[in-house]
Swiss-Prot record:
Induction: By abscisic acid (ABA) and drought stress. Disulfide bonds join 27-73, 37-50, 51-96, 71-110. Belongs to the plant LTP family. GO terms for biological process: lipid transport. The lineage of its organism: Eukaryota, Viridiplantae, Streptophyta, Embryophyta, Tracheophyta. It comes from Solanum lycopersicum. Residues 1-23 form the signal peptide. Plant non-specific lipid-transfer proteins transfer phospholipids as well as galactolipids across membranes. May play a role in wax or cutin deposition in the cell walls of expanding epidermal cells and certain secretory tissues. This is Non-specific lipid-transfer protein 2.
Length: 114
């Protein structure tokens, strides 16, 4: 029985050490993923590859914390990049056929995002 306990402890140890560590979403990932949207949001070009970035963001933001981070990054970008059409930004998820649980807007309260 003692040998079984040692083997069980070793197996658990290996699972903890070998298990991949989930990384949080970063603002850099959010902004680089949505960079193809900038010409569209500034009224300078077509939608192009933008929807791929929007869908990628939705897939990457798996946890409530990731969604809050993404929201905060998008809100910051909307406030700092001049010339963005906020109506187009808010409508981006619908145009791309995805459901993001918050409005892309400078006025969004990201602390309420789940």
């Amino acid at each position: 029985m003692e040998m079984f306990g040692k083997i069980a402890c070793f197996v658990v140890f290996c699972m903890v050490v070998v298990a991949p560590h989930a990384e949080s979403l970063s603002c850099g990932e959010v902004t680089s993923g949505l960079a193809p949207c900038l010409p569209y949001l500034e009224g300078r070009g077509p939608l192009g590859g933008c929807c791929g970035g929007v869908k990628g963001l939705l897939g990457a933001a798996k946890t409530p914390e990731d969604r809050k981070t993404a929201c905060t990054c998008l809100k910051s970008a909307a406030n700092s990049i001049k010339g963005i059409d906020t109506g187009k930004a808010a409508g981006l998820p619908g145009v791309c056929g995805v459901n993001i649980p918050y409005k892309i807007s400078p006025s969004t309260d990201c602390s309420t995002v789940q």
